[in-house]
């Protein structure tokens, strides 16, 4: 009975080194190929998540990822009509929005714009700036530190508004239904990035959302919890005076996440309108969120004031 002769070279040092090198090379090439194939999908998923968070902050989406529309004094489930390209009140339960439908809505009703510190608005085309490159360049930093400030507007749910270019919107800002400002700062463990959506009066909060944060689960990470985010709806980013009036030019601007309950601390005073209940055990994260709102919103003051004045003129004109 014959037996296979041993292969002495298998125990040689050079063979072991060669084998390890070949295995490492194969693994490196394999992982690089997988990354190259999956990178576009990961990027699209990240864009979808940011868009979803933005529209959730603006109350276009509810917290379950379904369209909603403000009709007859309340938010009602809605669907995206692919023929008219408008949102319509749902006859039955609204479906969860898919990536393709979200893209269609965003292209039709969301416009990225620029503003200077004086509140003057510009389109990216007017400034000869590529919007994709601008966002990619600054998205891991602070948009509020740039000479030209990025913001988004949500347009009215009409065919006329949908057909308007960014330049058209600037000429006719009355079609704007919401203003979305990028928010960035630092939590306990690292950077936090999100959005704050404001009504077209430049003051009343629609909502907030965070698309990137690494806070402690169950504690600071609750800034991304819908139950905590719901309390932002209806808050005011310009602090009202005790008499109930607002001096937009001089009053503090921002939202303060306090320690404890707003009701216990401020009751029904104007301060309560610009304050948010804190998160137990996450004081440092809450302080970081407060600072993020203050720093991110400050350069946009004149832009927000311009919308407040426009809203007041429209309100007076409709009387």
Swiss-Prot record:
Keyword Transmembrane helix annotated: yes
GO MF terms, alphabetically ordered: FMN binding; oxidoreductase activity, acting on NAD(P)H, quinone or similar compound as acceptor
Membrane topology: Single-pass membrane protein
One Gene Ontology cellular component annotation held by this UniProt entry: plasma membrane
Keywords assigned by UniProt, alphabetized: Cell inner membrane, Cell membrane, Flavoprotein, FMN, Ion transport, Membrane, NAD, Phosphoprotein, Sodium, Sodium transport, Translocase, Transmembrane, Transmembrane helix, Transport, Ubiquinone
EC number(s) from the headed UniProt entry: 7.2.1.1
Residues passing through the membrane, by range: 14-34
Recorded catalytic activity of this chain's protein: a ubiquinone + n Na(+)(in) + NADH + H(+) = a ubiquinol + n Na(+)(out) + NAD(+)
Gene Ontology process terms (BP): sodium ion transport
One Pfam assignment: FMN_bind
PTM sites of type FMN phosphoryl threonine: 283
Cofactor(s) listed in the protein's UniProt record: FMN
First-listed, main subcellular location of the protein, grouped into a coarse class: membrane
Subcellular location: Cell inner membrane
Functional summary from the UniProt entry: NQR complex catalyzes the reduction of ubiquinone-1 to ubiquinol by two successive reactions, coupled with the transport of Na(+) ions from the cytoplasm to the periplasm. NqrA to NqrE are probably involved in the second step, the conversion of ubisemiquinone to ubiquinol.
Oligomeric form and interacting partners: Composed of six subunits; NqrA, NqrB, NqrC, NqrD, NqrE and NqrF.
Similarity comment: family membership: Belongs to the NqrC family.
Listed name of the protein: Na(+)-translocating NADH-quinone reductase subunit C
Upper classification of the organism: Bacteria, Pseudomonadati, Chlamydiota, Chlamydiia, Chlamydiales
Gene name in the database record: nqrC
